[in-house]
Amino acid sequence: NIHYYFPAYPLPKKIIYFIGPLDGFGNSIGADYMAIGLQMFLGDTSSWYQSEQFQKYFPPYISQNFTPRFIPITAAKNLLQDIAPNSNLTRGLIIEMIEMGKRQYILKKILPESDDADLFGYSAAQYAATMNAEQNIWNYLLKMNLVYSKDPKVTSQLLSEGPFSIYFGNDIPGNVGVFIGAQIINSWMKQQSEQDQSNLIALLQMPAEKIFAESKYKP
């Protein structure tokens, strides 16, 4: 699917599986290869992941995704980051949410059979809670004038992984802004032609401000 949407991107010619240290990387891309560290995909209940030392690096809200079904998701995310590197959360909240939302939309196109919660890195309960709270989340961001915030702290609080959201409580994941960004993209895409919905290169190039203005997003 990546080659279909990004035909000019040279896919890795070799896939290398290995078992490395528990604090090592789970996926990396070289000049012509992709390396996958299986030690990072043993299943979230693996005894290896329960040690205090391991949880210093990867607390449960991260290791909940260390299961075999996340191998293709992690690989696709890394390939996408190689194709279109994202910023470091410095352009303001709404722009960063939409840029991350673009990548979630693309991820779903690349891996259409993967569960939506898994693509976000949320548990099933977190995803359901976020879906149910979407309108309240958006209204809060508007009410508190956070949508256009350029404060890097606010951006990080809403887009970085965490066990829960400091704004929306224990049931909502820390990076809830990624979900909102994806919903804005989905709202915008509903107004595009079928051909444009599959033009992922054009999506990446489309200014976030233009997408937001045209999305008419209102959950």
Language-model features: where?
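Acidic/His-rich structured neighborhood in mature extracellular/periplasmic domains
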Residues: 1-127, 197, 201, 205-208
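A cross-kingdom marker for long, charged
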Residues: 94-219
